[in-house]
A protein has these predicted regions:
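Hinge/capping helix and adjacent helix->loop/strand transition within the periplasmic-binding protein
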Residues: 91-97, 104, 112-199, 248, ...
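N-terminal (or domain-start) structured segment
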Residues: 32-123, 162-164, 186-213, 222, ...
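Bacterial N-terminal signal peptides
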Residues: 13-29
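Stable alpha-helical elements in mature extracytoplasmic
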Residues: 52, 56, 60, 64, ...
């Protein structure tokens, strides 16, 4: 359990770089920053079109295009679990015209699992700001005799064999959330990986696997219909979409905080004044009601803030997941 909170060498560097950029923003003017942008900005989404990451990107890109006076063009560049598109931004010119839709999987998990990721989240990127975060919901099939996290833990400890739980694949947040729960509570769980959320949900609804961590939009209808039973939210605070559902921390697992965090990042070396401008326009977009509502349909809550606040969240996620990935020996070649 201590491995999840173990200090990792160089862990403060990412935060230090972010803080330095904020300080510099107030002290220096960079050539070309005053009239930035003078041409379209490319926002790379490192996943195929159609997913929640693309929706997040388009929601903020439309608003930012209007306030920046130049188009923010969303370009999907998927492959290798998001590492191909992310790596391309790391190698892009640090001029503010190529930025990244960053995500928990690509910033905090993939580099720990994939020796060939080709980028270092701390060295190669500087944060612009967070877009929002989306919790998962711990759900069980109604046939499982557990109506709370405490009852689930008691059931799992008494079970003769590890309780199975599904996920859309090895190394996903859904997978690691289960491993994290097992590590924190001492219960034995058996991970059953699927090729995507669809097949996993099919087996969960059919009672072939008893539990799973699922996104809020997936959980909502099923929990309300009674086809699945929601036990807890994975984030530190409750969700406005399921306000009666307690958090795992409230349910006897102190400190449990697992979220999908979405944000914007730029290549390291991007002028601080450009970062400040992008942060300002991102926050303005997130303050609008229509963007908030669109994010809510994806199960996410808008969270405007500073670059250093986003850096701190990414750093905390990286510490948590890299420690767990190392402990479990998970690797993707």
């Amino acid at each position: 359990m201590s491995g999840l909170r173990r200090s990792i060498p160089g862990a403060d560097r990412f935060l230090s770089v972010a803080f330095a950029f904020i300080v510099l923003c107030g002290s220096f003017d960079f050539a070309g920053a005053d009239d930035y942008p003078t041409r379209p900005i490319t926002l790379i989404v490192p996943f195929p079109p159609g997913g929640s990451t693309t929706v997040m990107a388009r929601n903020v890109a439309d608003k930012m295009s209007a306030t920046l006076g130049q188009p923010v063009v969303v370009e999907n560049r998927g492959g290798a679990g998001g590492t191909i598109g992310t790596r391309s931004v790391a190698k892009a010119a640090p001029d503010g015209y190529t930025i990244l839709l960053s995500y928990t999987a690509t910033m905090a998990i993939a580099p720990s699992m994939n020796v060939n990721a080709g980028y270092d989240p701390r060295k190669d990127f500087v944060p612009i700001g967070m877009i929002g975060f989306a919790p998962n919901v711990l759900v069980v099939h109604p046939s499982l005799p557990a109506r709370s996290v405490a009852e689930l833990i008691a059931y799992a400890k008494a079970a003769p064999a590890p309780v199975q739980y599904g996920s859309p694949g090895v190394g996903t947040v859904n997978h690691l959330a289960g491993e994290y729960l097992a590590s924190e509570t001492g219960v034995k769980l058996q991970h059953v990986p699927y090729k995507g959320n669809g097949p996993a949900m099919g087996d969960l609804l059919g009672g072939h696997i008893p539990m799973m961590f699922v996104p809020i939009p997936v959980a909502l209808g099923n929990v309300k219909a009674g086809t699945l039973r929601g036990l807890a939210i994975t984030t530190a605070k409750r969700s406005g979409l399921l306000p009666d559902l307690p958090t795992l921390a409230e349910s006897g697992v102190p400190g449990f905080d697992v979220a999908l965090r979405y944000g914007l990042m730029a290549p390291t070396g991007t002028p601080p004044a450009v970062i400040a401008r992008l942060n300002r326009e991102l926050n303005a977009a997130l303050a609008t009601e229509d963007v908030k509502q669109r994010l809510a349909t994806e199960g996410a809550e808008a969270l405007p803030g500073t670059p250093e606040a986003y850096a701190a969240d990414v750093d905390a996620d990286e510490k948590r997941w890299s420690g767990l990935v190392k402990k479990l020996g998970i690797k993707v070649e």
